[in-house]
A protein has these predicted regions:
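Phosphate/pyrophosphate- and phosphate-bearing ligand-binding catalytic cores of soluble enzymes
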Residues: 9-11, 17-20, 62, 157-321, ...
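Beta-rich strand-turn-strand
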Residues: 112, 320-326
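Conserved kinase catalytic-core segment
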Residues: 155, 327
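Anion-binding (especially nucleotide phosphate/pyrophosphate-binding) glycine-rich loop
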Residues: 1-153
Length: 365
């Protein structure tokens, strides 16, 4: 796929303002792609120039290095949505540059189930299959029909069925074995009218307190947004606790024996969510607090949210190095106490071989 589009990348563009964490240096080159042809042209341009590229979506899941990125940052701005019907199901295709929560709101307004628990998650549609975003008992992979991608290896546009995407907990082939190979251009979802997902602990408790006996997708979205706001997990310029990447660490999945071992150490049993393989997912926030990192913890220009221990926040003027220092301390503290080693959720951009990033991303401390 060879594009004839003429590119005009900008030089030395600041990146800190393009991420919700607000850290990071400039991009050597920056370009916004509003059509799939722009993606193809940018890939060829980088190959000709011999420089790396990084594909940017909504910037809500990134830690950008203080030195920035010495290559091309390609921001995906492909927009547009379309809807068709297949019996009772609605088939929705959305451009990768569409804002995720706006799409969720539209689908909820139509009474369609499958997205309601994913309300309030920042970023763009294109980032959702990469991370296999999930919350409160739902994962986006359960609603995905196929993903249209630009293949940087053979320079073609491909459609990958959900079964070809390698979806797992907070994982996909796009950030696993094939990381860097594909650029998500649009995503097609299958949704249908029906009862919402409303059994996950926090959501179920909120609905019970609100005396909701027959949940709807709209009521569940309202509940999820309220819960996320209470934790500083909805991006809000007026809320300093939202100057973060959201949950910095994934909830670890452990054996039942390890859960009981943690209970003995902590003197109380951690809550858990049973997985299909017999293991249990326990809250990283629970482990972090019991390792001594409480809500409101301050470490210079960074800290832990006053609302939720999973969010590491930029308190103002922080550098990426400050964020890594705190993240490393949290991972080390949890690992030392419980021998459970947390895995970070965000993507680290521009760091090269960095000892802090290496420590954070390896399976054990």
């Amino acid at each position: 796929m060879r594009s004839s589009r003429v590119l005009a990348p900008r030089a030395n563009v600041a990146l800190a303002g393009l991420g919700t964490l607000g850290v990071g240096g400039p991009a050597r080159w920056f370009l916004r792609a509003e059509h799939v042809d722009d993606v193809a042209a940018a890939r060829h341009w980088c190959d000709e120039q011999g420089i790396p590229w990084f594909v940017l979506g909504g910037g809500s899941n990134l830690v950008i290095a203080d030195r920035g990125f010495d290559g091309l940052v390609l921001q995906i701005g492909i927009t547009g949505t379309s809807t068709s019907r297949d019996s009772e199901d609605s088939i929705i295709t959305a451009g990768a540059g569409e804002m995720w929560d706006a799409l969720v709101a539209t689908m909820v307004d139509r009474g369609l189930a499958g997205f309601e628990c994913l309300s309030g998650i920042p970023g763009t549609v294109g980032g959702t299959p990469i991370q296999n975003v999930g919350a409160y008992g739902q994962e986006v992979s359960n609603a995905i029909e196929h993903v249209t991608v630009y293949d940087c290896v053979d320079h073609t546009l491909r459609s990958l069925r959900a079964a070809e995407c390698g979806f797992a907990y907070r994982m996909s082939r796009f950030k696993g074995a094939d990381e860097g190979r594909f650029v998500v251009c649009d995503v097609t979802f299958r949704l249908r009218p029906g009862p919402p997902t409303a059994t996950y602990g926090d959501v179920a408790a909120y609905l019970k307190r609100s005396e909701v006996t027959t949940p709807t997708v709209s009521l569940v979205r309202h509940a999820v947004l309220a819960i996320r706001r209470s934790k500083g997990m909805v991006v809000d310029a007026h809320d300093p606790d939202s100057r973060s990447v959201g949950s910095f660490f994934m909830n670890p999945v452990v054996s039942e024996a390890d859960r009981e071992r943690v209970a003995v150490i902590a003197g109380e049993r951690p809550p858990g969510f049973a997985m299909d393989d017999g293991r249990v997912k326990i809250p990283a926030a629970w482990l972090i607090e019991r390792a001594g990192f409480r809500k409101g913890h301050v470490d210079g220009a960074v800290g832990i949210s006053t609302k939720h221990p999973l969010a590491l926040v930029n308190r103002g003027g922080a550098a990426a190095a400050d964020v890594l220092r705190l993240a490393r301390a949290v991972k080390q503290g949890v690992g030392d106490r419980f021998d459970v080693w947390l895995t970070p959720e965000p993507i680290f951009v521009g760091f090269g071989v960095d000892p802090d990033v290496t420590f954070l991303t390896k399976a054990q401390g």
